[in-house]
Structure formats: structure tokens, C-alpha cells
């Protein structure tokens, strides 16, 4: 059975060119880039080339890029560095819909005496800039938000957030793990101070990422030891991963033109599902959204049941973040949006890539209506019960 992979916000297929670029650094050019001999030196040059490729994709300088192991490390490093640089400030602002790699760090910091403001979002997943303005104080060290939500694809007004953070004297960090390679970036003209990315979300292997640190932003390293990454991230370099990320960044720049094609396929999927299946709606902002992502709610059934049914046909989708998919709780993102109980528990995410085909989308459109019809036929919730649940959603959630 062939696989139709529509879970690209969880991870992506490694591009064949990326694999070809990294393999020689596992078998042939395996020297340590910190070594003084020529064998290690040529590896060091390749690492610098990869750094330049990542910088070019971001519209940044090579010196502003450090390699990390993943998005989680980058987020931890950015948040803790911002606080270490401003020990007199004890306030952080983030949002209620962040990835666990941000929210759980903030919860840990609250236990250490920091005050954290979690900005709310509206029913379309957008923040209120007036709420941000009201939250900013002279004690605010950091504003940390995602660029685009991993579950709904909703894109935040990043530059407007950044300008407000700057006016308040706060450092602005952006978790752009879902956005890099999907939206054009030019950090030279941006208000972003630090930005996190992860290789496995843009067709590089798992275990490699990068952190952008604007020139002049004070940074205390999370990992201390050797002199690697100009003293900003200790540890022997993951050279094959760095080469892979560099090549993936180069290809991502080229494939930014595919965004229109991805959006057309995404829209075809959405429109087909909405027209064929009643009591169905798209979760998130109608326009300010990643071109590859759709989060759709099907009333009166459980999202997990839909995913299991799709899995029988080799179709891979998700009910939310892969980092929390083992939890039986409903999505914290959709809860924050205030969605009704019936949509909250019946929502799934499809996330496309440059490899997604029209035939794959049509296959999903063929299979979804009978799957939903069958699940609704055996669902314990009638329309009347569902209406009752909507009025009781808060009680049931607890």
C-alpha cells in the first residue's frame, strides 16, 4: 500500500539532493572542522558554506547564524539568553497557542519567579495587538511568539509585534520552525532579534537546526564547553547535518515559488471537503495562513477516529502537534480559540509539501465523505446532544 503523506508540519521527507550532499561527510570527508590539518579544514569550509546558505534563505549575515540540534534547543537557548542578558527584568510575553518548546520553558521559568503573560487569541487564532501593548512594561525582557502556528497554519503579524516589543525595550524572539521555507524572509530589515528554525521541517534530516541572533544582541550560550560556533554553542559539530541543512535551505529558496501550487492544492482539498461533507468548517484565519496547512473540524465525531480510518488507506494526517499527539487531551490551540466542543474534538490537520500531488488530494476527497458518514452513523452524539454539549463544553473540559 502506497503512503499519502499529508503530515508535513510534523516532519518532512529528506530531499534526495539533501541526502546526496550530506552522505560524503559521513563516509569520505569525516574530519573534525576544528582540527588544524587540511583534512579538517576542508570540512570547516563546507560548514561555512552551509552557514551561508542558511543565512541567504533568512536574509541574514553568516555571522548571525549558529547551528543547533533542533527547534527545541534553539527556543531554549534564545529564551534563556534573552533573560540572562537582562537579569534586572523578570517579565516574559508569549501566547496561549505556542509549541510546547516555548510554553513548557515559560512554565519552568514561572517556578523560578518570572512573570509570564500568555496572550489570548480570537476565534480565528489571531492575537490582539492592543492586548500586547497593554502587557508590555519596563520589566518585560522578552516577547516570544511563533511566526506561524503548527496546528492551524495561522500567521501572526510579526513585524507589528516586533515593533511594539522594540518600543518597549524588549528582545523579540520568533519560533519560525513552521514558517521557514514557506514564507520569504528578510531579517536584515526585520524587527526580529532572534529566530529559531529546524531542519526536519524543510526536507533536511532530524537532529539539525539553527538559531539566528541579530548582530548586537547579547547572547549567553545554553551549552558551555568548547569554542565551537564561535563560542555560542559548544559541542563537536554535526557536520553532515549542517551540510544537509545548508542544501535544504538552498532548495527551499528555489522552491518558494511552489507556494502557489501548494495553496491551490490546499484550497482544492478544503473546498472539496466543505462541499461534500455537511457540518464541517475550517479552523483558523481565512487568509493569514500558511499555504500548505488546513485544520478542519468535522462535527459529532472524534478526530482520532478519522485519523485511524485514514491510516487504513495509507493516508497520514494529524490531530495536532506531533510533540503532543500521545495525549488524549484536545488541542490547546483550538481550546484557546474558543471553538465549540463538537469542532474541538473532531478536528484534524492536513499539511502538504512540494511533493504533494493532485492525485493524492483527489484520493483523500474520494475517501473522506464515506469515512465521516460511517463514523457519524455510529457516533453516540446526536445533533441535540451536540447542541447540549456546546453549552456544557467548559464543564466537560474539566
From Swiss-Prot:
GO BP of this protein: amino acid metabolic process; nitrogen fixation
Top-level EC class as recorded in UniProt: transferase
Molecular function (Gene Ontology), one example: cysteine desulfurase activity
Keywords: Iron, Iron-sulfur, Metal-binding, Nitrogen fixation, Pyridoxal phosphate, Transferase
Binding residues annotated for [2Fe-2S] cluster, in chain numbering: 323
Name of a matching Pfam family: Aminotran_5
Cofactor: pyridoxal 5'-phosphate
Glycosyltransferase among keywords: no
Listed EC numbers: 2.8.1.7
Coiled-coil intervals: none
Residues with N6-(pyridoxal phosphate)lysine modification: 201
Keyword Transmembrane helix recorded: no
Family annotation (SUPFAM superfamilies): PLP-dependent transferases (SSF53383)
Gene3D superfamilies tied to this protein: 1.10.260.50, Aspartate Aminotransferase, domain 1, Type I PLP-dependent aspartate aminotransferase-like (Major domain)
Record's subunit section: Homodimer.
Protein task: Catalyzes the removal of elemental sulfur atoms from cysteine to produce alanine. Seems to participate in the biosynthesis of the nitrogenase metalloclusters by providing the inorganic sulfur required for the Fe-S core formation.
Miscellaneous comment in the UniProt entry for this protein: Belongs to NIF2 gene cluster which is expressed in vegetative cells and heterocysts under anaerobic conditions only. This second system appears to serve as an auxiliary system that does not suppress expression of the first system.
Family according to the record: Belongs to the class-V pyridoxal-phosphate-dependent aminotransferase family. NifS/IscS subfamily.
Protein name per Swiss-Prot or TrEMBL: Cysteine desulfurase 2
Organism for this UniProt entry: Trichormus variabilis (strain ATCC 29413 / PCC 7937)
Organism classification: Bacteria, Bacillati, Cyanobacteriota, Cyanophyceae, Nostocales
Amino acid at each position: 500500500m502506497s503512503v499519502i503523506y499529508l503530515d508535513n508540519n510534523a516532519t518532512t521527507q529528506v530531499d534526495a539532493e539533501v541526502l546526496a550532499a550530506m552522505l560524503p561527510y559521513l563516509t569520505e570527508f569525516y574530519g573534525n572542522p576544528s582540527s588544524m590539518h587540511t583534512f579538517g579544514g576542508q570540512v570547516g569550509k563546507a560548514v561555512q558554506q552551509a552557514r551561508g546558505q542558511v543565512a541567504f534563505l533568512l536574509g541574514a549575515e553568516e555571522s548571525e547564524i549558529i547551528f543547533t540540534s533542533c527547534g527545541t534547543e534553539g527556543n531554549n537557548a534564545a529564551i534563556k539568553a534573552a533573560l540572562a542578558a537582562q537579569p534586572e527584568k523578570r517579565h516574559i510575553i508569549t501566547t496561549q497557542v505556542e509549541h510546547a518548546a516555548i510554553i513548557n520553558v515559560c512554565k519552568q521559568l514561572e517556578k523560578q519567579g518570572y512573570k509570564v503573560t500568555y496572550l489570548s487569541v480570537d476565534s480565528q487564532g489571531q492575537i490582539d495587538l492592543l492586548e500586547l501593548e497593554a502587557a508590555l512594561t519596563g520589566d518585560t525582557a522578552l516577547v516570544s511568539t511563533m511566526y506561524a502556528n503548527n496546528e492551524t497554519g495561522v500567521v501572526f503579524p510579526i513585524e507589528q509585534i516586533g515593533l511594539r516589543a522594540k518600543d518597549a525595550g524588549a528582545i523579540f524572539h520568533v519560533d519560525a520552525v513552521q514558517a521557514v521555507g514557506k514564507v520569504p524572509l528578510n531579517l536584515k530589515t526585520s524587527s526580529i532579534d532572534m529566530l529559531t528554525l529546524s531542519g526536519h521541517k524543510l526536507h533536511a534530516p532530524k537532529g539539525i537546526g539553527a538559531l539566528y541572533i541579530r548582530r548586537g544582541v547579547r547572547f549567553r550560550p545554553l551549552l558551555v564547553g568548547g569554542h565551537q560556533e564561535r563560542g555560542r554553542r559548544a559541542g563537536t559539530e554535526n557536520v553532515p547535518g549542517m551540510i544537509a541543512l545548508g542544501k535544504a535551505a538552498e532548495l527551499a529558496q528555489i522552491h518558494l515559488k511552489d507556494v502557489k501550487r501548494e495553496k491551490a492544492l490546499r484550497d482544492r482539498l478544503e473546498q472539496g471537503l466543505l462541499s461534500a461533507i455537511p457540518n464541517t468548517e475550517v479552523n483558523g484565519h481565512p487568509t493569514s495562513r500558511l499555504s500548505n496547512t488546513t485544520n478542519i473540524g468535522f462535527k459529532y465525531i472524534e478526530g482520532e477516529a478519522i485519523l485511524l480510518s485514514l491510516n487504513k488507506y495509507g493516508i497520514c494526517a494529524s490531530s495536532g502537534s506531533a510533540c503532543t499527539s500521545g495525549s488524549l487531551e484536545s488541542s490547546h490551540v483550538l481550546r484557546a480559540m474558543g471553538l465549540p466542543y463538537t469542532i474541538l474534538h473532531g478536528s484534524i490537520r492536513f499539511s502538504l509539501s512540494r511533493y504533494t500531488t493532485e492525485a493524492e488530494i483527489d484520493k483523500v476527497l474520494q475517501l473522506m465523505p464515506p469515512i465521516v458518514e460511517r463514523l457519524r452513523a455510529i457516533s453516540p452524539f446526536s445533533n441535540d446532544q451536540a447542541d447540549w454539549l456546546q453549552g456544557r463544553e467548559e464543564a466537560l473540559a474539566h
